[in-house]
Amino acid sequence: LCSLCNQVFADDLTSATDWPDAGHGAIPSTAIYHIGVGEIFLIAGQSNASGVGKTPGFDPPHPLVHLCRNSLTWTTAAHPTNDATDTAHPENADFYLPGTSPYLRFGTTMCRALGCPIGLIAVSKGDTYLGQWLPESDETQAQYPLPDCYPAGSLWRVVEMAVAAVGGRIAGVAWYQGENDADDDAMCTAYAERFARFVGHVRTLCRDSALPFFTVQINKATDGRTTDVHCGMMREAQRQAAHRIPRVFVVPAHDLPMSDAVHNN
């Protein structure tokens, strides 16, 4: 896990009988924290992945679940998971007050299920389109232009940085996105196909054709910007993606309470 801090920890520990006698003087030592032999998951998507829940709940840290924050430092995973303090990649910095995220519980659940330490890498960003997560070179980008303040491919570069920092391999992607694309008829209709392309790009990047994606259907929207029809279209696209793309899984969120017009609580 410590490769994200630009450190590689490798040593050959001999038996204690070969160590210097402590009576001969001080022995130099180094303490290296947050090392685990386990699995690393990438957290990507928009604000409901970043975490904006406002009601406190019992969701304590777990000693075997760690988080690589936006500052590229490892800590015991705790809310808020997408804190932008000292971020190393400002492209995904969220500068609003963060709240609780579903992915601390995801980490503890994976830890119990797999029986090993879990590392989470936070790269999500609120108010983003799928086109920002696709590579700028993806051939569908020209068909679905984004507003000027949402540069195509901007979040894909963050994904590349995060994957490279852990040696190019991760165990899976936790993905929660789609609210922005649901505002646009064409993007909503094309979402399943374009998401399949995103999955393919990430799997190619990680050299793992079976890399799992754990996705969440969007909840409803009550801000007047996105209609119930569009939300339903997006949820159906996300359901279809999980049926059509191998090792893409989906869970619903439309039964969750909300903290405001678009965010889960």
PLM feature spans:
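Cell-envelope and extracellular/periplasmic
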Residues: 1-265
